[in-house]
Structures are given as structure tokens and as C-alpha cells.
Amino acid sequence: MQSHQNRSRLSLILRSRFIPSFSSPLSLFVVLAAVPLPIYFSGLLSGRNNKPLSVMRLNSNLASSMVESNISCTTFNILAPIYKRVDQKNHSTRESDFRTLWLARNQRILDLLLHQRSSVICLQEVWVGNEELVNMYHHQLSSSGYTIYQLARTNSRGDGLLTAIHKDHFKVVNYRELLFNDFGDRVAQLLHVKTVIPFPLNGKQDVQQEVIIVNTHLLFPHDSSLSIVRLHQVYKILEYLEAYQKENKLNHMPIILCGDWNGSKRGHVYKFLRSQGFISSYDDAHQYTDSDAHRWVSHRNHRGNICGVDFIWLCNPSDSRKPLRTSWVEAVFSIIKYQLHKASIAEDDAFTFLGAKNHSDSLTYSDFCLALQKVNLTGIPHGLSFEETKELWVRADLDGNGVFDYEELKKIWNMTMVNQPGNCKESVMESKKEEGEDEAIGLKVNKAILFPQEAEKGLWPENYNISDHACLTVQFSPVKMLCS
């Protein structure tokens, strides 16, 4: 078990544990696991009588035929007992007050995870403040061959993240922690791992896949002013990934991020990640589009709303990814547009709402700053910084004449966050690279499953009570890619 303390006032803290350096030029950034087969659990926890699990395997022949190179990931927000309400009339009564309840529920969670036997398990809302529960997870997971990494949220929030790596599948090269030290005391784990079994890149060469596992849990959007905080959290993760790749001279690698993103496919975080070349693995497996937000759910929140918020994001190798800062600015402008839409302000009226007298008028930098306050992006403790505001102004003043006019507003209003295609293509293993092409190993999504099964149909079963989140498992297979 790792115990950590927050000893810095920096907005983002990076801590690392270095394990032997890696040498292969072909690396992967992924949140993965080797699952023997997708599994549905039926009749699970329908009442208080703690009936044993009834298990139904899907495609049982898959287990024996699956090649060793297949990998998969399980991500699951297990609902910390300190947050689980047990009395709807008295919200101050939590499961953490009743040992028999939280002990039994978490044992059923462990039964599910150990039966799946994913090579990487990423958990959120682990009750790290309770030694008995922590020991329970560490003992059972380590006894089953997992190495465990744990990270508490800052400011003694009581819960945190846990990532378990199966020793039969991955060797840990490097482990780092990100402490955002922001409004929500959120954190992230990054693990650089390498496959134990080499992957045949071609007929002459075997390589060990190198992988980065990212596990995180973003802030819940209690109100629209927190949109910028959530965007900051994702930006910090992507910014650090870029720095890590540069520091270790890593090129052409897939990246997978997983966790509870506390936002749906309609949100700014989703669009931001899509603009950086990421795909939702679950949607890719089921051939859903970005507009298919209603097809599946993974969470019923404390307000009783059901939505899809748990993702395993995949970004395959590419040299043509849009600059991160460009995507960031586009995402902030998207928030401004959303806030105006939410206030029922159309494009024709937006300019006057922001402070202009009419369409022939223009806004100075001071006017622009006041406009940002109106849409909850500045003037609040967790809003845009001075430097970010200046950068936004430079991007808004397209012609560089020192003022912001209506024509520039229209261009921003009509701007869309385009999903960024890559310049690497999947190739058959026997194919030879052309001049100017580089070889890389990418990932192909084979299968993605939500448990409980009803969540895949956009429904939430009333008898499901091991968490307020669904468990998501995605299976990948490595593919050769040629990057031009």
C-alpha cells in the first residue's frame, strides 16, 4: 500500500516512483487488462438477503480461443460508503455507519472483479480512510496476483483511486501521481507498464508493449461554473501526458484514459477529448456515434438522473494531433456559447449581452473581461487565470486590432470542435512500411460490456445495488500501424 500526503501548494503536483527504464521505441499509453471473456452477472444483489451471485458467461468458447496478446480494462466507481445514502428520509445517514452493510457490498464487488480477472482494474471512490476496507481490497487482490497502487484525494476527503495491475500480464515501469489541488481535490494515477509476453510485430521481431494507465475521477458538475474546473482537470492530464512522452522520447503510442468522468457525451469534456483524437471505446465497440448519448448509461446520480459518465478513452498513434492548447481554447469558447444558449440568448443578441451597444460596436479587453464574468468563467476562485484570459483575448481578436467586434464573435459562434483524425492507419502484420512511414503498435477495440446488462439499453435496474455506477470492461487487441 502506498500512503501519500499533500505537502505542496502548487496547483498540480507530480510525484513519481521510477522502476527500471524502458528501451523499446514502440510504446503504448493505455488503461488495459486481459480479461478471459466478457461476463454478465445476473440476479445480483436484488435484496438485503445477500443471496450468492448467479453468473452467466457470454460466448464461453471465447475464453479458450482468445490469444494471449488480447488485453482489456475494467473501470468501476464502487461508491464509497461515506457517500452511500441508506435512508432516503435522512440523507445524513450513510452506509459507513453500518459495518455489515459496507463489508458485504464491497465483498460482492470484489467477487465481481476477481471473477473477471482483468489484467488492469481501475477503481474510483475507494474508501481509503477505512483501514479495514483498504486491507480487504489489498489482501484479496494481491492474493490473486495483482500489484496495487492507491491514491487518496487531497484535503482528507476520505476516498480515492485504486489501480491494480496483474503480474502475469504487465510489469510496472513507472508510477506517477497527479494532485490537481483544485476546487474538487481531485487526483489522477499514471502507470507506465510493459507487457510480460512479447507481441509479434512481424515475422522477424517480437516487442513488449509499453502502456500508460490513467485512472481518474473528475469533479461532479454541481453547477455550470464548474465546467471550467472540469476542463482544467482534463487539460492537466493531457498536458502531463505530452510532457511525459517528450521527457522519455516516446513516439507513436496509443493512449487510454479511464475512470468516472462525471459528464456525458453531450458535455464539454467529451468534446474536448474527441477534438484531441480520443474515441470512446464502448461507443466504438457498438458502432455508436457522438450523437448516440441516449443508447447507454453507466450511472444513476444522487438526483435520480441516469446518464453515461464512465469511459475508457482510446487515442491511437498519430503525428497530426491538433495542438493541445488550440483544443483548450476552442473548448472554452464552446463553454461561452453554451452559457449563452442556456440563457436563451441567440447569436444576434449575444454581442449586446456581452457588453456591446450594437453590432457596429466593439469590445475592449476590459469589456471582454467583464463579459467572461457574465458567463461564470472569471471572477470566481476556480475560474480562468489572468494568463488564460489574456490568451483567450488574443485568440478572440482574430485581426489583432486590439478590439473584439461582431464579425469575430460570429466566427467563434460558428466554430465547432472538430474531431481530429489521425495520420496512422491499421496495417496487416505482414505488410512492409513504405519510405517515410514509421511502424507503431495501436489498439483495436474488440468488445465492450457494461454490467448490469440493462445499462447497455439505457435503463437502470432497481435491484442493482452494489454501486450507483455500472462496471465497464473493454477488450482490445494490438494492431500494427503505419504512420506517415
Swiss-Prot record:
Q: Where does Ca(2+) bind?
A: 397, 399, 401, 408
Using the UniProt record, give the first listed, main subcellular location: membrane
Q: Which residues form the EF-hand domain?
A: 384-419
Transmembrane annotation, as ranges: 25-45
**Which keywords does UniProt give here?**
Calcium, Membrane, Metal-binding, Transmembrane, Transmembrane helix
Subcellular location field: Membrane
Q: Which organism is it from?
A: Arabidopsis thaliana
What is this protein called in UniProt? Uncharacterized calcium-binding protein At1g02270
Membrane topology annotation: Single-pass membrane protein
Pfam families given in the database record:
Exo_endo_phos (PF03372)
Q: Which InterPro entries match?
A: CCR4/nocturin_mRNA_transcr (IPR050410), EF-hand-dom_pair (IPR011992), EF_hand_dom (IPR002048), Endo/exonu/phosph_ase_sf (IPR036691), Endo/exonuclease/phosphatase (IPR005135)
- List the GO molecular function terms: calcium ion binding; catalytic activity
User: According to its record, what are the GO cellular component terms?
Assistant: membrane; nucleus
